């Protein structure tokens, strides 16, 4: 028999000789591997009797981490040794002459993976290559980017193609673990676009020279174990920013990608890249552990969804992305700590954007942008702590939005935006910890939703958003601590919204929402403990509101809201620490002309009620020039500790300075504030009955009782503090409020018409998405 075939059979016989010791001829255990190394390679091992030597070699070879070495893993050892010996002998035989190809081998060897060259070696291992799991027949430029002219270098450019772990962009045929076009994922979180990868030294079996260009993570054999290579340096060379987690690359943690590489803490992106450990993305990719996606992707554990996604545990979505800490999206890519995106890019602390970008931590928005921890979105994406959204983006503390962006402390907004912590939104989103959503997405524990989303600690909403401490709103703006908004949603911990969906524990709903503990709503949202209501919402302790929302610490609402301790309002908003309202925000600044109906006499202005939750004395802001009507007749609230009429309100925003002046003026004329439980004087019983009839749950009854008690308390205090002018003003204001309510009802009917038009617009957008999806499928077919 030929010498080469005898050598091949000898390699196989040695494996079976030691593998059959425990009865399993297919695997080598640790003890059997030790015997094989001592007997066969003892002369060249640096420390043959050192237990760490066996442990190190076992860890390098054991790719499936089962504690045993199978035949193809055993072949890796043989290949490594053959390559090292060949390299040494070749250098000696040629003296000082070294071809460029050999220098490429040296560079690859410095990267802890000796190069494999020469037709002789391919012939020698032709049969082993057939048996090798991680090797495969060579393609002529098949796995190379734009094709490499050199036969042996083509797979070394930007990553090696291998049989198991390479994901190919533009669909390369692969045997195991190939993911789809524009959406690849890999066994151990490796996403590749325009790029191939291998796990340790797979291409060596197929006779491919791994040049210095490849950094797919080779195990450092020489210089670490075998004495004949102790002079070699463990230098990792990376091309186009290949990700390498540590100096040793074990490919499961360091993926190479073409035009798409990232490092653990440096995100490089071309058309958007992201990944904590080096996951690459092509035109829309993945998240923390390498989930890739096209027009909607996945996240940490690869949960996929269509048109509406979720995040923390790896929900991917089509036309909608999210992930736990690195949401990628089409035309928008993030990465774990550096969010990038196409048509809007950003990174962790230097976010750049195209078509509108904003703020400190890089919230971009237009065709979707991510945020601090890399949330990007196309047609709306969220993530666990930073949700971005299309036509309106946001991030953790910097809400951005399309047609109106904002940043952390400089909030801009289209059609009027505001807020201390930067809530901006137009058709848009915002929240403190990243509430995104437009046609949007789910939340932390993977609640997915269709056309409307929420997230774990970030509320998303369609046509108006809010968040815990920074609520944004459309055609209506909130105040310092996040009063939202129009058509808009709010809640502290996971309220989802219009055309939208679930929350922290995965409550989903269509055209209706829920919050963290599963509150669902229709055209109206609840708050922390999940009070749901139809055309009427309530908050933590059962406050209902009509067309409005509330939340635990920032009750906002459209068409009437309530706040934490059960103050309900119709056509108005409030929140715990800063009540805002749509079509007129409640604040002392009503005297500034926000309320068209309080623009009359000075006496009426003085009698206008200050809306505040009383919890911490924070007054709600109102954006000047907002349209709408104010129906809150909230009286002054004071906590038990606030018994002095000349109480001092600490300004929290410069924008409230004028409000405090007005408040002081009102308080001087009204020395006594009502004692009580933070009851806000509410609108007339007629308004309450209207709100009550539209509540969908029984909490409305208890809430009504509380409100009646609030009226009694207020009346009692009014009699106790019989101040003639003050009582007269109160009664006059009460009548004015009844008139306001009638006008508000008319406005409500107009808003219903707007909603119908919005639904029609929504259906048109759905049709556009279907066309986009069809176009995308056509592109996929064309690329195939």
UniProtKB/Swiss-Prot annotation:
Cellular compartments annotated: Secreted, Extracellular space, Extracellular matrix
PTM entry text: Potential substrate of transglutaminase. Some arginines are probably converted to citrullines by peptidylarginine deimidase.
Domain EF-hand: 13-48, 49-84
GO MF, any single term: calcium ion binding
Keywords: Calcium, Extracellular matrix, Metal-binding, Repeat, Secreted
Main subcellular localisation: secreted
Polar residues composition bias: residue spans: 286-296, 304-343, 356-392, 400-486, 504-584, 610-646, 680-695
Residues where Ca(2+) 1 binds: 32
Organ and tissue specificity: Expression is scattered in the normal epidermis but strong in the acrosyringium, the inner hair root sheath and in the filiform papilli of the tongue.
Composition bias, Basic and acidic residues: 124-201, 704-722, 729-784
Gene3D superfamilies listed in its UniProt record: EF-hand (1.10.238.10)
Domain free text: Can be divided into a N-terminal domain with significant homology to S100-like calcium-binding proteins, a central domain containing a series of short tandem repeats, and two flanking segments with low homology to the consensus sequences of the central repeats.
Protein name in UniProt: Repetin
Annotated source species: Homo sapiens
The organism's taxonomic lineage, starting at the top: Eukaryota, Metazoa, Chordata, Craniata, Vertebrata
Encoding gene per record: RPTN
């Amino acid at each position: 028999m030929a010498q080469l075939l005898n050598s091949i059979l000898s390699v196989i016989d040695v494996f079976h000789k030691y593998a059959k010791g425990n009865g399993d001829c297919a695997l080598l255990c640790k003890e059997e591997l030790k015997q094989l190394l001592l007997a066969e390679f003892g002369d060249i091992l640096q420390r043959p009797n050192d237990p760490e030597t066996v442990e190190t070699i076992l860890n390098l070879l054991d790719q499936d981490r089962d504690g045993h070495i199978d035949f193809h893993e055993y072949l890796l050892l043989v290949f490594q040794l053959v390559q090292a010996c060949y390299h040494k002998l070749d250098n000696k035989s040629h003296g000082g002459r070294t071809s460029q190809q050999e220098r490429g081998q040296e560079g690859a060897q410095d990267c802890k993976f000796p190069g494999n060259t020469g037709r002789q070696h391919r012939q020698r291992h032709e049969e082993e290559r057939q048996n090798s799991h991680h090797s495969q027949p060579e393609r002529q430029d098949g796995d190379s980017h734009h094709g490499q002219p050199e036969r042996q270098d083509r797979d070394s450019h930007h990553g090696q193609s291998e049989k198991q772990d390479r994901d190919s962009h533009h669909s390369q045929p692969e045997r195991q673990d190939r993911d789809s076009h524009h959406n690849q994922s890999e066994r151990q979180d490796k996403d590749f676009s325009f790029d191939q990868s291998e796990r340790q030294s797979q291409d060596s079996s197929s006779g491919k020279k791994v040049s210095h260009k490849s950094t797919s993570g080779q195990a450092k054999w020489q210089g670490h174990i075998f004495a004949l290579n102790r002079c070699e340096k463990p230098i990792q060379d990376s091309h186009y920013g290949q990700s390498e987690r540590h100096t040793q690359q074990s490919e499961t943690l360091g993926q190479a990608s073409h035009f798409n590489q990232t490092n653990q803490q440096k995100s490089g992106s071309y058309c958007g890249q992201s990944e904590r450990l080096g996951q690459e993305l092509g035109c829309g990719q993945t998240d923390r552990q390498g989930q890739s996606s096209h027009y909607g992707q996945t996240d940490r554990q690869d949960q996929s969804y269509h048109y509406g996604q979720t995040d923390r545990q790896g929900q991917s979505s089509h036309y909608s992305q999210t992930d736990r800490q690195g949401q990628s999206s089409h035309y928008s890519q993030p990465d774990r700590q550096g969010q990038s995106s196409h048509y809007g890019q950003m990174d962790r602390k230097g976010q750049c954007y195209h078509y509108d970008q904003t703020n400190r931590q890089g919230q971009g928005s237009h065709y979707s942008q991510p945020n601090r921890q890399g949330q990007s979105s196309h047609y709306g994406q969220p993530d666990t702590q930073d949700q971005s959204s299309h036509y309106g983006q946001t991030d953790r503390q910097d809400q951005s939005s399309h047609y109106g962006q904002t940043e952390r402390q400089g909030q801009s907004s289209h059609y009027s935006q505001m807020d201390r912590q930067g809530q901006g939104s137009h058709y848009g989103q915002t929240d403190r910890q990243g509430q995104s959503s437009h046609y949007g997405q789910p939340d932390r524990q993977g609640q997915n939703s269709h056309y409307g989303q929420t997230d774990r600690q970030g509320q998303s909403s369609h046509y108006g958003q809010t968040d815990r401490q920074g609520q944004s709103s459309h055609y209506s703006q909130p105040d310092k601590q996040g009063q939202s908004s129009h058509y808009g949603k709010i809640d502290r911990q996971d309220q989802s919204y219009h055309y939208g969906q679930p929350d922290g524990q995965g409550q989903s709903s269509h055209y209706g929402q829920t919050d963290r503990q599963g509150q669902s709503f229709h055209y109206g949202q609840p708050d922390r403990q999940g009070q749901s209501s139809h055309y009427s919402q309530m908050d933590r302790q059962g406050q209902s509101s009509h067309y409005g929302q509330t939340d635990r610490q920032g009750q906002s609402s459209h068409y009437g809201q309530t706040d934490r301790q059960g103050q309900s309002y119709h056509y108005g908003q409030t929140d715990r620490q800063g009540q805002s309202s749509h079509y007129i925000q409640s604040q002392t600044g009503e005297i500034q002309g926000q309320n068209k109906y309080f623009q009359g006499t000075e006496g009426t202005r003085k009698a206008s009620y200050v809306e505040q939750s009383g919890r911490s004395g924070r007054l709600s802001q109102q954006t000047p020039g907002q349209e709408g009507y104010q129906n809150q007749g909230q009286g002054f609230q004071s906590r038990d500790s606030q018994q002095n009429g000349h109480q001092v309100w600490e300004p929290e925003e410069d924008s409230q300075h004028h409000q405090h002046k007005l408040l002081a003026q009102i308080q001087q004329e009204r020395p006594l504030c009502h004692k009580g439980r933070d009851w806000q004087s509410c609108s007339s019983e007629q308004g309450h009955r209207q709100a009550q009839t539209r509540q969908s749950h029984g909490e409305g009854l208890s809430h009504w009782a509380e409100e009646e008690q609030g009226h009694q308390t207020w009346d009692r205090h009014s009699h106790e503090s019989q101040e003639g002018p003050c009582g007269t003003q109160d009664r006059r204001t009460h009548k004015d409020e009844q008139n306001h309510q009638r006008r508000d009802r008319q406005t409500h009917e107009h808003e219903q018409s707007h909603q119908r038009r919005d639904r029609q617009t929504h259906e048109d957008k759905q049709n556009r998405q279907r066309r986009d999806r069809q176009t995308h499928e056509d592109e996929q077919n064309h690329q195939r």
